[in-house]
From Swiss-Prot:
Subunit-structure text: Part of the 30S ribosomal subunit.
Protein name: Small ribosomal subunit protein uS17
GO cellular component: cytosolic small ribosomal subunit
A biological process from GO: translation
UniProt-recorded Gene Ontology molecular function terms: rRNA binding; structural constituent of ribosome
Function: One of the primary rRNA binding proteins, it binds specifically to the 5'-end of 16S ribosomal RNA.
Entries under Pfam families matching the protein: Ribosomal_S17
Similarity comment text for this entry: Belongs to the universal ribosomal protein uS17 family.
Alphabetically ordered keywords of this record: Ribonucleoprotein, Ribosomal protein, RNA-binding, rRNA-binding
Length: 76
């Protein structure tokens, strides 16, 4: 995967042309020496309102669309 492209799960699709996508990654905890699952939620632009809750989507960085949206949906 190239830089600026992430894969995540749609957690909220109630707004018009906007979905929330949760992106999970595994990191090594420095103190506890264990693998920990981290999550980050992105507001993503969905022009055609095609995404539904639970869909696995690929998102890409984009120029700012609004105050919180800097990502767009590439693939469903």
């Amino acid at each position: 995967m190239s830089k600026g492209v992430l894969v995540g799960v749609v957690t909220d699709a109630r707004r018009d042309k906007t979905v929330k996508v949760s992106v999970y990654r595994m990191v090594h905890h420095k103190v506890y020496k264990k693998i920990v699952k981290k999550c980050r939620v992105y507001s993503v632009h969905d022009e055609q309102n095609r995404c539904a809750r639970g869909d696995v989507v690929k998102i890409r960085e984009h120029v700012p669309i609004s105050a919180t949206k800097r990502w767009i949906v590439v693939d469903e």
